[in-house]
Amino acid sequence: MSTHTQSITGRHWKTGDWISIEFNQKKILSISSAAHGSMNAPWLAPSLLDLQVNGYGGVDFQKKSLSEASLMKAVEALNRDGCPRFFLTLTSSGWPSILSKIKRIKVWRDNNPTLRKCIAGWHVEGPFLSKEPGYCGAHDSSVMEDPNPEKIQALGEIIQTDPTLLTLAPERPGSMESILHASQLGMRVSVGHTNADTACLSAAESAGATGFTHLGNACPQKLDRHDNLIFRVLDCGSWMTGIIPDGVHVSPALFRILHKLIPLNQIYYTTDAMSAAGATPGRYTIGNIEV
């Protein structure tokens, strides 16, 4: 095996300081200060971990036709674009279908070293979400259903100890018991695609919910100026808050406001990427919507 050592000089992503990184076989050997370099030098940062990836590089993780080969294609494209680890996200469909998809993909992941390294966990986003227009987002409202501990137990038996994020709307019947059971099984529960009132949000937090999925997204274009979901979330609890920072899902003004009100260690960014991301121009699907 080659022991050839390489180095790269650039600016630290957080401090702006000039640094030199020495590495061998993709393993970092040392990081040291460096003299100022070219203005065209790269910014050097850790690779990304994305907690919400629905597909990539022309590959839709929701499709029944998904194969191990096509999943590898998506993983290679994500790695190429700086995201070597992600939570594979499955969106709303019938609960048996969700379980079947995870079970099938998990077999590939558990037996393929590349997939095992890159798929850091699972994000189950639905079908325990709101059916209300706006709050259901791009999800198919016709497949929404109520959670219960038995459904959560079935998920737990498949994922075992894999890191798992479960997004649900806490106003659905059975949610509090399901949040509690999911938390007891080691899952992280995030509230999202919801129009829960303040009391319901507080109850969800007490039951074990710790996060909010892509705040500012999955809500109607027009909100009540006195009482709306964004206000309730900001006024209730200390959520680990996801944001899609693309200037579209959250406006630049709201992006700045959220960063003033939420501690930085309670914010994470996600792309919420779908199959069109990282792909050539063309027609792609997200749920039942063609883009």
Predicted feature residues:
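Divalent metal-dependent hydrolysis catalytic cores, especially in the metallo-beta-lactamase
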Residues: N54-D60, M72-R104, K117-S130, I159-E171, ...
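Active-site glycine- and acidic-residue-rich loops that bind
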Residues: G94-S100, E171-P173, S190-N195, I244-L261, ...
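Surface-exposed amphipathic alpha-helices with a cationic face
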Residues: K106-R109, I179-G186, H259
